[in-house]
Amino acid sequence: MKTTEAGKDAVKLLKKQNLVPVPDAPFPSFYNALSNKVYIDSSLNPADIAVNLAGTARQLHHKQVLTKLDMAEMKAADGVQCYRLMQADAEAHKALMYYALKSNEALPYSPEMPGGISVHSVIIQKAMGASDEKALDAAVKAFYNDHQAVQTCDLLYARNQHLTAYNIDRNPSLAPGAKLFSKDMPDKIFEKICSVGGVPYVKQEDFNKTPFKIMFQNRRNDIARMVAPFSKDTSIMKMPTFEKVEAANAAARALATKNR
């Protein structure tokens, strides 16, 4: 896979949408599911628009992989993990597009560096000669080191899923037969989320480790309370918490000091 292939994949997805320029928009670019349109801040330079559209195109890809109903029916723990990964994938693609444009000195415009950890991971990986696949894989995994970004994902998951579940619960005709927060995540879904042209660039089993599942306890409890009116699903309570892991680490350090 080359950067041009990732770009072509993004263009295919964006071609199907109505792109709406908005001067001084509150976001560089974003997809509105209700209007099925992509809004772009037309005051940005073309390079910055391209970087942000790379991330928005991934949102459209995710929409094809997991529908809103799929997310509503997925058990909370699995839903949280998918939601995080989708954001990580979008950030990784923005970072790769930034690197490609920044590296091309012939372009008349230069993009601003995106925020977050992912872009630094891409720059380091590409400087070491890594392929685009490896750079994307590393960028996705680096995203999880930004605990504030991950916690924001968890907050957005809770808000969005509560609204969806509430609407379906009040109006069953919106999704006849839907069983909220009841299903396990589909097989190999991580590899489908993180794929370009149908080719995955991550391995699902890499994300079974604690660093990719850990949560703040208060956010975990908030999600459990959100799910309770709609389902008996308690999967979220099995997710490890920073507080518990830190307590275990502190106990281990104390024991090591005592045994010196």
Give the ranges of each region predicted by the language model.
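Post-HExxH zinc-binding segment in Zn-dependent metallohydrolases
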Residues: 76-120
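Pan-zinc metallopeptidase signature
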Residues: 125-260
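Substrate-binding clefts and substrate-entry loops adjacent to catalytic sites
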Residues: 66-80
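Active-site-adjacent bridging/hinge elements
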Residues: 28-32, 61-70
